[in-house]
Amino acid sequence: DVSDITNVRFYTSIDQGSYIPPHWHRAVEIIYMQEGSLDITVESRSFTIHPGDCTLINANVLHSTKCTNPNKAIVLQIPLDFMEKYIKSLPYGDKI
């Protein structure tokens, strides 16, 4: 679901097997793996997350995902506009 007020996306992803090609967006993305696994490539670094793992993908960073077996994850995407508006002083804000 996407909040009309904040544009923050919070949803459960159930994936039977897919590939999302390299892309980027102006949102911080947090993925918490509940079941299965997910292969993630962030810029040139690839890794796999498993149940109980959580990863944060920064805004404006090229990334892709590949699901090779069924999985279930909780996904939170927080737009930079929201963070800049409601969090006045971000530590390391120039790095986001």
PLM region spans:
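Conserved metal-binding segment of the jelly-roll/cupin
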Residues: I49-L62, T68
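A generic structural motif
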Residues: E35-S37, S44, N60-L62, P70-N71
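A hydrophobic/aromatic-rich effector-binding and dimerization subdomain
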Residues: D1-V8, L62-I96
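Generic protein-terminus/edge-of-domain signal
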Residues: D1-H50, C54, K88-K95
